Structure formats: structure tokens, C-alpha cells
Regions:
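Localized sequence-composition bias
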Residues: 1-173
Length: 173
């Protein structure tokens, strides 16, 4: 992320300079708040949208947009493949597409995150475009007690910090 600087968006205005090949080219990778605003800081309790914009320049190919998310310790937090049923195993016509993956609120841990975006065919495997760690953002926990942290203020390690649904049964003595 450019010597520690995080940027929430990268755009390739010149398609010849964009990651890709003769059939598909990335045009932009962005991170957005639920409101649609591009930002580099997120409240841990709120959803985060990862977005890739791409041009299909040659019709008839099947593509899967992919995001790889890394934390500040360069640990791979997750890999997400687009499973939108409308495009699953469907050859795409030429045109511009925008695919968005939503990370639920109360799921990531605090800290800096970087995002790689890829465009691939799964079967048979073929990598069409790869934009490694081009965007990034920071996740912050306000410590107000309504996140997974609750009222605990000590160090909380881990690559995710989900606020899980808990149920407790009580049996009186």
C-alpha cells in the first residue's frame, strides 16, 4: 500500500494500462461504506463493500471476480469468489460490469486491511487479471460496548472478530 499509505480506490483510466488481457480488463477497485461513500476508515460494527469494475472486451467467456483480503501482518484473512447466481457459469457479453462483495459488520478485527482483486475462470483455471494489494482501509472499534469487544478493553488478537449470536439456557437450582 505504497509505503504505508492506504488508498480506498484505484482506477485505470487508460484500458491499455489496466490489469487484464485480450478478453477482460479491470477498470477500478474500490472500498465503500454502506452509504456508497468511498472511504478508508470503517466502524467495526458497519458493513464494508468491496467493489471491482471491469470491462469484458471479448464476449463468450466465463469470469469470476475474486477478492483476497490481508491484514496488517500480511495474513490472508479470506478469499471471496463471486457467487452471484445470475452470472454463475454464464458467458458474459461485452460491456462494463461492477461486482460488489459485502463484508458484514462485526466480522473483521481492528486494523489495516489490504485488498487484491482478481478476475479468473475457475474450470479450467485461467487467471485473466490480477491487481495485488491495490486498495486498503482501516477498521476501528470505538469501544462503546456494542461490538464483539463488549466492555473488554485489552488486547484482542485474531484475524476476525465476529459478533456471534449466543443463546444461554438457565435452569434454576
Amino acid at each position: 500500500l505504497h509505503a504505508g499509505h492506504i488508498q480506498p480506490v484505484v482506477e485505470w483510466l487508460d484500458p491499455t494500462q489496466a490489469p487484464g488481457n485480450d478478453v477482460v480488463r479491470l477498470r477500478a477497485v474500490r472500498v465503500r461504506a454502506e452509504s456508497g461513500i468511498i472511504t478508508d476508515r470503517f466502524d467495526i460494527r458497519k458493513p464494508i463493500d468491496l467493489e471491482v469494475e471491469f470491462d469484458v472486451v471479448k464476449a463468450g467467456h466465463i469470469f469470476v471476480p475474486v477478492f483476497n483480503l490481508y491484514n496488517e501482518e500480511d495474513v490472508l484473512v479470506f478469499i471471496a469468489h463471486d457467487r452471484d447466481q445470475a452470472w454463475q457459469r454464464t458467458p458474459r457479453p461485452t460491456g462494463r460490469y461492477t461486482s460488489t462483495a459485502r463484508i458484514p459488520g462485526n466480522w473483521l478485527a481492528e486494523g489495516m486491511m489490504s485488498v487484491s482483486s482478481l478476475m479468473m475462470t475457475e474450470d479450467p483455471f485461467r487467471m485473466h487479471a490480477h491487481a495485488p494489494r491495490t486498495i486498503g482501509f482501516r477498521v476501528d472499534d470505538s469501544g462503546t460496548g456494542d461490538s464483539a469487544r463488549g466492555d473488554f478493553h485489552g488486547r484482542w488478537p485474531g484475524v476476525v472478530r465476529p459478533l456471534l449470536e449466543w443463546r444461554t439456557k438457565y435452569l434454576p437450582a
